[in-house]
């Protein structure tokens, strides 16, 4: 018994749940907005399936005498206009099947795996594996995507829509919105290439090349607009309600598309060649490709659907990468427009979007370039030149990944606001700065020596302020631990008289009573633990000669010419070694008669190390290193 596309085997997701319907219900729900998704459809098949449904619904409505509103209306239109060509599998060999030409007389008919019917190419190293049979639903999706396949070698020519990169518009949720928007764009299209040398078509079958006798490489100018072509493939029934495929493996495509442009409204076009913009050969999926697909560029014309479709709130960019009969991958990106506001990216909005895109791409380029010098700073050139280059490449790649999608989403959101060049640039700069901070945090996390990392941070901070007007290091909000230690140190300092300080300074190994009285202000839990108590005992000796307040410990160590190697050792040490180096730094301050110094960070360093709080410890290390590096840099600049 033949399988018809009007039989209820297509699973759809609707507001009430999931159900199985025929093609007429799919078309009806596409136009009433209740079709949410196809659970059985792969994501890479979305653009081909939406295109097939949009072309079909556009043509059915064009050649119908009355509006198509209900499922029964669509069924009547399908039956009256396509008739026996609604058979998916099991029809007469001498008549066309849905999306399948008559193969009799075209050559040897051979069995064909159902996977190769689709547009992806199966292989042992691909996710997609070869299958000989499939359900009617899977086979239907494969047929709709069939002519999107590129040339697959001898006997497997490409289809007319081979590997098109597409831009679909809708509400960002339902597939119905994308089908209806694209169908409306076809309604409004005036073709420039397709059908320019042919008579006006009179019926839907004129557009369905699979419903006509096979012609090899028929010029696109002689075909009606729009059309659905085919490959030399047919489905045949298999056991268990499944279907398999047969093929005539001959060269020669059904359509000679010339440049490849067949006036599809959702396809960006290359300015230089007039052909479709594709992910071919060296062009890979990237943020630049996505910007060009939606905003256009000097090399790419925006797809006309952005002007022709009714107001929409999202754009979906899809593409398949390929090279020499090899599928590289499938990519898709969804973007909100105007913060969810329904609008059209028409001529005026399109021009503004194009200008915003140029500025956003420039910001991404500048942000990536900002990493060059700073990323090479933490690594000695003689030993780690190759290593630093690898880290630089990784950091720039990570930054571009973060900014790529964000840059296009940001400018699409800005369309909801009135034009304001300065405000827009501030938004773009803030976006770049936020990404640079995150990438830099990860990039420097593995640097063993904090001082070179601090110098690199200062270099990046300067570049960010110069290019984006944004700092790398935002104002440090005091942590609860830091605030508490800061308050304790001020309390200790306030209660120490000159006599108390003299007593502490003159003490040898044992702390005097004055020191223990000062230590009474320390947190009890720290004094109960030997490791944290040692930190407080060491720092109270500093208060014998140094007042709490003024410059940070890093800046003071730099001012007193404390050796850089000792600072690095201090910041990298742990446990008892750290306590010893803190004591050494304290003695250095006292011996150099430092009058005022904010000791908070060095206490936080010791306490967090003892507690095993690595995150808080790294923050303290960073503050000390930055203070030291900043003061050294200032002194060298002044020299």
What do these predicted ranges mean?
Residues 141:
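Gly/Ser/Thr-rich loops at beta-strand to alpha-helix junctions
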Residues 1-124, 133, 144, 149-480, ...:
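Extended alpha-helical scaffolding segments
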Residues 152-153, 477-542, 546-639:
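Basic, alpha-helical nucleic-acid-binding regions used in initiation and control of genome expression
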